[in-house]
């Protein structure tokens, strides 16, 4: 399924836990809260030049919303959300929803389905090349003097006389958008609108994530959990 026709859900990473399968195996899962995903706008080919659904998640104080945003949300009849995201979908999918509709998790996903989860990785501050780029340390002795954890040469001198763009060097580590692909859904708690996804997803507890159908792998049946 391509990104151009897949509707996803916005959520908040609750944390990690483990489930047990019918065979007694333990499965590490990440719990994602996808409750109250509401449609704020339905875009169509005729009006906007493409088909898409705009979805809001979370809640925000009215005092924190700009007047244009307040008018946009009032037109849809929904409360302000912490995050707003647009999903490109087909005309058939867009026709199933109207502004103000709450999208349940079971309408989009099923147990055993493979999904891609996008979030902001945990920021780790300023880091050296060994931690940031997985480079190797230099020799501990045998002629090495105070150059144990330095990256080494970063370019030539007179020609070209500069450091090429993209050279892996020290800098800020983390706090970037990351996507973990092909994770399967182990369980869906419809009462609390929770997705339990096998493995780890980007970000810290309480961070926002986007969950959508996997675009690269073929779906495979996952073992059911109790």
From Swiss-Prot:
PROSITE patterns: RIBOSOMAL_L3 (PS00474)
GO biological process entries: translation
UniProt modified residues of type N5-methylglutamine: 158
UniProt feature, compositional bias: Polar residues: 137-150
One family name in Pfam for this protein: Ribosomal_L3
Cited InterPro entries: Ribosomal_uL3 (IPR000597), Ribosomal_uL3_bac/org-type (IPR019927), Ribosomal_uL3_CS (IPR019926), Transl_B-barrel_sf (IPR009000)
GO molecular function: rRNA binding; structural constituent of ribosome
Top-level taxon of the source organism: Bacteria
Keywords: Methylation, Ribonucleoprotein, Ribosomal protein, RNA-binding, rRNA-binding
Residue ranges, annotated region (Disordered): 135-158
Stated family: Belongs to the universal ribosomal protein uL3 family.
PANTHER family, sorted: 50S RIBOSOMAL PROTEIN L3, LARGE RIBOSOMAL SUBUNIT PROTEIN UL3C
Assembly and oligomerization: Part of the 50S ribosomal subunit. Forms a cluster with proteins L14 and L19.
Record-given protein name: Large ribosomal subunit protein uL3
């Amino acid at each position: 399924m391509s990104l151009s026709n897949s509707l996803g859900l916005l959520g908040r990473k609750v944390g990690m836990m483990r489930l047990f399968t019918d065979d007694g195996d333990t499965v590490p899962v990440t719990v994602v809260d996808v409750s109250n995903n509401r449609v704020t706008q339905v875009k169509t080919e005729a009006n906007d030049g493409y088909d898409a659904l705009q979805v809001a998640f979370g809640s925000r104080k009215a005092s924190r919303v700009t007047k244009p945003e307040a008018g946009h949300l009032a037109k849809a009849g929904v409360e302000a959300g912490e995050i707003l995201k647009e999903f490109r979908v087909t005309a058939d999918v867009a026709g199933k929803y109207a502004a103000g509709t709450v999208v349940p998790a079971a309408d989009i996903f099923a147990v055993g389905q493979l999904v891609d989860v996008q979030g902001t990785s945990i920021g780790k501050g300023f880091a050296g090349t060994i931690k940031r780029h997985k480079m190797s340390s230099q020799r501990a002795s045998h002629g090495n003097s105070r150059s144990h954890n330095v990256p080494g040469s970063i370019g030539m001198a007179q020609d070209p006389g500069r450091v090429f763009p993209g050279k892996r060097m020290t800098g800020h580590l983390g706090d970037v958008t990351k996507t973990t692909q092909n994770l399967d859904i182990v369980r869906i708690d419809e009462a609390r609108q929770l997705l339990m996804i096998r493995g780890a997803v980007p970000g810290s507890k309480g961070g926002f994530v986007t969950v959508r159908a996997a675009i690269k792998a073929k779906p495979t049946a996952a073992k059911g959990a109790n």
